[in-house]
């Protein structure tokens, strides 16, 4: 460190270089403190700490001869400098970094004393924090042991605190802010003073380590000569201990003791209020160049990743640049672990390390176990990525750019999985299951070609192989069956776990993937055999959302396969609910006051199921089911009570009540007008309206879907026509029906025969004439139906009154408690 001083004499009796360091380090703090307190009883300490330490009589005489402009004059601390002298001389005092820190410590100590006089604990708390930060910088710059001004301040503060604790009446009289500050200072002082127990004990006994260290080297240092007004003095070899050893790029190297002390400090301050997390990250980043051993690097990287993740909050995700740094640090940690996989293992079940600085003791096989969890780190990184997508506008390019980072995350998950497989016990598969369930979450909803591409990128940057999910070949990555095999392998491991959450999530994801690939019967059988319908109501909200998504995807799969009835049954419960978005994890309730936890349950946008497509499929399925059913029960008095889809019936009734119906504008209008056309038997108009819906382009094979819908509309149009107009015919030719609905005669005959067999249509088939002969039954008018219903109700009422008059015949079968209850009610 450079020292500037000015001298007006060539005398050799000037202060030595050690005197300069000593007076600069202690004078600005101790002298001002002693002067504030009215002096110190210990004359030796006063002489050592004072700026104006008395030298020999000869030295003082020389200084007097030079008019008080010797070297010691220009080393006055800024806190005690005489402004009049500075104005007279016009000289500027240049302070070193150490002098400035000591001056700052002295200033904080003075303000703390002022706060003690007026009992202002808010001021004391603020200045105490500043004091500790200055002391932290003092330690980092390796200026030596804690100075006396700092030790004296914390000792006196603790004594004053103990005195205040005895005055309980005064504590009760404090206001809220002062009381909170008092409790905070009490906790911090006790915790802080434990770190300086040795220095405090030495101070209490009357000594000072910092002064003794300087006194040892004081005699060996030559006194500098002042040749000019300002002279740069080169430090001697004896003062090398006060300089910091630096590495590459001039960065200071930290000793192992200081390194693990910093790690301990960061660990203890995590999760506390008023903690500067960014400063903690900077501290850990500064430790990386000093980490020379593998154990030190692992310790620093593990703490650095966790601390970076703490930069996020509950209501905001981690910034993209910080998230990328976390992924980079985690990959660096994995690289170190993979390179030293035969000597170091980071596992959760590792025993606690007795000597943190020396590291863990090696086992018989030479492996050293470090307590930690790589799986937990990558889980938090995955959660931060999901949170970022949740709180981001999905309709911007930023969302797409952020989504590209998923491949980096997936590759990191794969590396962690391979590491856990190597270091963990074969019987302990919990850590492996935690990673596999994350991989399943990233893959189960994606098409096969996207899964193949993701696997190709992930395995391209990873060496080695995996037992649970072997490395795919080039042929596998171009196959459409590899994604199904991959998900089956991962789910098979999850099925063996004792944790029901893992098993349930694996089952639902497996069913979802089968349904997405149009394997309806496999998905349906697996879904029914799981018996999740009976227990899902008590599951976690996230599992309930996944259950609803799987059920909806099963219905979409049935619709694509042409199974209209199965599709309608699967979609009925979810699509009829007004909380559709909330049930699928794609939004919140309309008028609900959602908190942060509720918002985090919403899935990222790229995993959503298109709600417009879902509504279109459900309404089309209800159309093909409800219109023939309405036509079959049109003459029944209880026709309105027999409903397949209440939602569809309500929409249709609303559409019929409209005075004027314009051209269809949306999906719902197309389907409602198609329903009215189908009721008339005009299947062609219904087909044109349904096929005109643009949402079909989102399905994999839209033309095949439209062809399937055309066939279904022809069949259901034929059934609706027969249900509506059969009583107007005595016989009806099958060829005529075939021409009307453009169906083969064989198909028409099969449909009519099935309706007759199920007693839906009164009549019979005449094979000679190739026609259907209807049986004309007696048809009741609307008035007759109402009269019959009224007579039935009157008869029931009369019978009940007769039993009541007879003495309560209907109560004979009741139990005795029920009879007493009925009698009390009377």
From Swiss-Prot:
It is found in: Cytoplasm. PROSITE patterns: PCI. It holds the Pfam family PCI. It comes from the Eukaryota. The keyword Protein biosynthesis applies. InterPro entries: EIF3C, EIF3C_N_dom, PCI_dom, WH-like_DNA-bd_sf, WH_DNA-bd_sf. Its main location: cytoplasm. Residues 21-30 have a biased composition (Low complexity). Residues 218-227 have a biased composition (Basic and acidic residues). One of its GO terms (molecular function) is translation initiation factor binding. Residues 10-20, 32-65 have a biased composition (Acidic residues). Disulfide bonds: none annotated. Component of the eukaryotic translation initiation factor 3 (eIF-3) complex, which is involved in protein synthesis of a specialized repertoire of mRNAs and, together with other initiation factors, stimulates binding of mRNA and methionyl-tRNAi to the 40S ribosome. The eIF-3 complex specifically targets and initiates translation of a subset of mRNAs involved in cell proliferation. This is Eukaryotic translation initiation factor 3 subunit C.
């Amino acid at each position: 460190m450079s020292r500037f001083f000015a001298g007006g004499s060539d005398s050799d009796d000037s202060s030595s270089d050690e005197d300069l360091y000593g007076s600069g380090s202690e004078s600005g703090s101790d002298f001002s403190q002693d002067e504030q307190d009215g002096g110190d009883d210990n004359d030796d300490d006063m002489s050592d700490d004072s700026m104006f330490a008395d030298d020999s009589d000869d030295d003082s005489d020389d200084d007097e001869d030079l008019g008080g402009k010797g070297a010691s004059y220009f080393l006055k601390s800024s806190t005690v400098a005489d402004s009049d002298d500075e104005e007279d001389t016009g000289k500027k005092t240049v302070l070193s970094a150490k002098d400035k820190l000591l001056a700052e410590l002295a200033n904080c100590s003075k303000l703390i004393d002022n706060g003690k006089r007026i009992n202002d604990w808010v001021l004391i708390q603020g200045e105490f924090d500043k004091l500790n930060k200055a002391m932290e910088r003092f330690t980092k710059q390796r200026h030596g042991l804690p100075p006396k001004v700092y030790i004296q301040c914390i000792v006196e503060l603790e004594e004053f605190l103990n005195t205040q604790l005895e005055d309980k009446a005064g504590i009760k009289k404090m206001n809220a802010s002062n009381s909170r500050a008092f409790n905070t200072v009490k906790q911090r002082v006790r915790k802080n003073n434990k770190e300086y127990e040795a220095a405090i004990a030495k101070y209490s006994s009357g000594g000072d380590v910092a002064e003794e260290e300087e006194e040892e080297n004081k005699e060996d240092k030559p006194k500098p000569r002042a040749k000019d007004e300002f002279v740069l003095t080169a430090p001697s070899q004896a003062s090398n201990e006060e300089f910091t050893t630096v590495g590459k790029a001039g960065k200071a190297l930290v000793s192992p003791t200081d390194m693990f002390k910093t790690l301990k400090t960061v660990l203890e301050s995590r999760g506390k209020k008023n903690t500067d997390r960014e400063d903690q990250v900077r501290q850990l980043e500064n430790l990386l160049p000093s980490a020379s051993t593998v154990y030190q690097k692992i310790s620093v990287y593990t703490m650095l990743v966790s601390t970076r993740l703490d930069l996020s909050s509950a209501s905001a995700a981690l910034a993209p640049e910080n998230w990328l740094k976390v992924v980079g640090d985690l990959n660096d940690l994995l690289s170190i672990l993979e390179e030293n996989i035969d000597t170091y293992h980071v596992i959760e079940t590792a025993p606690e390390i007795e000597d943190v600085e020396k590291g863990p003791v090696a086992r018989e096989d030479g492996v050293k176990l470090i307590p930690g969890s790589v799986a937990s780190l990558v889980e938090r990184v995955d959660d931060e990525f999901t949170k970022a997508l949740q709180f981001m506008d999905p309709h911007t390019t930023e969302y797409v750019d952020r989504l590209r980072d998923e491949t980096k995350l997936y590759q990191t998950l794969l590396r962690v999985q391979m590491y856990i497989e190597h270091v963990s016990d074969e019987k302990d598969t919990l850590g492996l299951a935690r990673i596999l369930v994350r991989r399943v979450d990233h893959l189960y909803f994606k098409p096969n070609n996207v899964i193949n591409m993701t696997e190709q990128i992930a395995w391209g940057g990873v060496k080695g192989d995996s037992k649970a999910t072997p490395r795919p070949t080039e042929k596998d990555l171009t196959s459409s069956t590899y994604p199904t095999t991959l998900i089956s392998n991962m789910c098979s491991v999850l099925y063996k776990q004792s944790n029901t959450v893992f098993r349930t999530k694996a089952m639902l994801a497996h069913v979802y993937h089968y349904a997405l690939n149009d394997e309806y019967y496999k998905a349906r059988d697996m879904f029914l055999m799981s018996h999740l319908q009976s227990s899902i109501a008590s599951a976690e909200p996230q599992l309930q959302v996944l259950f609803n998504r799987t059920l909806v995807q099963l219905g979409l799969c049935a619709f694509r396969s042409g199974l209209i009835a199965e599709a309608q049954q699967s979609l009925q419960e979810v699509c009829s609910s007004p909380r559709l978005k909330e049930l699928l994890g794609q939004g919140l309730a309309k008028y609900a006051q959602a908190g942060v936890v509720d918002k985090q349950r919403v899935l990222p946008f790229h995993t959503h199921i298109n709600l417009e497509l879902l509504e279109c499929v459900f309404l089309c399925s209800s159309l093909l089911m409800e219109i023939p059913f309405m036509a079959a029960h049109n003459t029944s008095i209880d026709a309105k009570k027999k409903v397949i889809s209440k939602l569809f019936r309500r929409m249709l009734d609303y559409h019929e009540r409209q005075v004027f119906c314009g051209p269809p504008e949306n999906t719902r209008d197309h389907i409602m007008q198609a329903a009215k056309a189908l009721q008339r038997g005009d299947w062609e108009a219904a087909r044109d309206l349904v096929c005109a819906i643009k949402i079909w382009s989102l399905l994999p094979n839209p033309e095949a879907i439209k062809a399937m819908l055309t066939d279904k509309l022809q069949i259901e149009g034929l059934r609706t026509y027969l249900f509506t107009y059969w009583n107007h015919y005595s016989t009806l030719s099958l060829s005529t029906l075939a021409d009307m609905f453009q169906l083969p005669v064989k198909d028409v005959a099969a449909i009519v025969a099935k309706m007759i067999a199920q007693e839906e249509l009164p009549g019979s088939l005449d094979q000679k004439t190739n026609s259907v002969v209807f049986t004309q039954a007696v048809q009741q008018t609307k008035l007759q139906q109402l009269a019959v219903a009224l007579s039935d109700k009157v008869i029931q009422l009369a019978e009940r009154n007769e039993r009541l008059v007879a003495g309560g015949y209907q109560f004979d079968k009741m139990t005795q408690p029920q009879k007493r209850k009925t009698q009390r009610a009377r």
